[in-house]
């Protein structure tokens, strides 16, 4: 999935927890 883009976001570490809630985002 496009997880790379999520990690590159300004959220950084927060992206990990957020990814669990919105894995399709």
From Swiss-Prot:
Keywords: Amidation, Hormone, Secreted. This is Neuromedin-U-25. It comes from Oryctolagus cuniculus. Disulfide bonds: none annotated. The keyword Secreted applies. It comes from the Eukaryota. It holds the Pfam family NMU. It is found in: Secreted. One of its GO terms (biological process) is regulation of smooth muscle contraction. The gene is NMU. SMART domains: NMU. The modification Asparagine amide is found at residue 25. One of its GO terms (cellular component) is extracellular region. Stimulates uterine smooth muscle contraction and causes selective vasoconstriction. GO terms for molecular function: hormone activity. InterPro entries: Neuromedin-U_amidation-site (IPR018070), NMU_C (IPR008200). Signal peptide: none annotated.
């Amino acid at each position: 999935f496009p997880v790379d883009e999520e990690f590159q976001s300004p959220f950084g570490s927060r992206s990990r927890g957020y990814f669990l809630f919105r894995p399709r985002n």
